[in-house]
From Swiss-Prot:
<keyword id="KW-0413">Isomerase</keyword>
<comment type="similarity">
    <text>Belongs to the cyclophilin-type PPIase family. PPIase H subfamily.</text>
</comment>
<feature type="domain" description="PPIase cyclophilin-type">
    <location>
        <begin position="15"/>
        <end position="181"/>
    </location>
</feature>
<dbReference type="InterPro" id="IPR020892">
    <property type="entry name" value="Cyclophilin-type_PPIase_CS"/>
</dbReference>
<dbReference type="GO" id="GO:0005737">
    <property type="term" value="C:cytoplasm"/>
</dbReference>
<dbReference type="InterPro" id="IPR029000">
    <property type="entry name" value="Cyclophilin-like_dom_sf"/>
</dbReference>
<dbReference type="GO" id="GO:0016018">
    <property type="term" value="F:cyclosporin A binding"/>
</dbReference>
<dbReference type="GO" id="GO:0003755">
    <property type="term" value="F:peptidyl-prolyl cis-trans isomerase activity"/>
</dbReference>
<dbReference type="GO" id="GO:0005634">
    <property type="term" value="C:nucleus"/>
</dbReference>
<dbReference type="InterPro" id="IPR024936">
    <property type="entry name" value="Cyclophilin-type_PPIase"/>
</dbReference>
<dbReference type="GO" id="GO:0006457">
    <property type="term" value="P:protein folding"/>
</dbReference>
<keyword id="KW-0697">Rotamase</keyword>
<comment type="function">
    <text>PPIases accelerate the folding of proteins. It catalyzes the cis-trans isomerization of proline imidic peptide bonds in oligopeptides.</text>
</comment>
<dbReference type="InterPro" id="IPR002130">
    <property type="entry name" value="Cyclophilin-type_PPIase_dom"/>
</dbReference>
<protein>
    <recommendedName>
        <fullName>Peptidyl-prolyl cis-trans isomerase H</fullName>
        <ecNumber>5.2.1.8</ecNumber>
    </recommendedName>
</protein>
<keyword id="KW-0539">Nucleus</keyword>
<dbReference type="Pfam" id="PF00160">
    <property type="entry name" value="Pro_isomerase"/>
</dbReference>
Length: 182
């Protein structure tokens, strides 16, 4: 596999190595839009690298966490490394959530990385990857990145059967087995 070329924007690149049911699926590389939403991008980047620490100094982040919600023709949601079921959230500043940075970027294409939230100003560790344009999410969820390489992996995740363990929960664990910065 040839080395990943960095984006001309100078924005950071991070990656997820994904497994389904314990079997390697592939790598997704994301460009984080630090130039537009620096705070939101940095929150995600630190959870990818493991730089973020709990109050007692333990690393915390996405490595080993699951995508707990997958809806075909919509999105794949993950980032709850606290509880694994969509109920947990935190941010790198030691709070449960932080404010919406801005809504400059729109949900106008597949492969966008956006903050999952429970309403205005409730961003934390949870995120989703769009699989189609989702303009109805504009001005409600902060777009902070996009798939740079590996949309084929996202589409395979999207095709994972759901429903056995909960309506939108994958039947097989979809796990971020490794993650970091390029």
């Amino acid at each position: 596999m040839p080395p990943t070329k960095l984006p001309e924007s100078g924005n950071p690149l991070v990656f997820f190595d994904i497994t389904i049911g314990g079997e390697p699926l592939g790598r997704i590389t994301f460009e984080l839009f630090k130039d537009v939403v620096p705070k939101t991008a940095e929150n995600f980047r630190q959870f990818c690298t493991g730089e973020s620490k709990t109050p007692v100094g333990r690393p915390q982040g996405y490595k080993g966490s699951k995508f707990h919600r997958i809806i075909p023709n919509f999105m794949c949601q993950g980032g709850d490394f606290l509880n694994g079921d969509g109920t947990g959230s935190t941010c790198i500043w030691g709070f449960k959530s932080f404010e919406d940075e801005n809504f400059t970027l729109k949900h106008d294409q597949p492969g966008l990385l956006s903050m999952a939230n429970a309403g205005p100003n409730t961003n934390g560790s949870q995120f989703f990857i769009t699989t189609v344009p989702t303009p109805f999410l504009d001005n409600k969820h902060v777009v902070f990145g996009k798939v740079f390489e590996g949309m084929d992996v996202v589409k395979k995740m999207e095709a994972t059967k759901t429903g056995y363990r909960g309506k939108d929960m994958p039947n097989l664990d979809v796990v971020i087995s490794q993650c970091g910065e390029m």
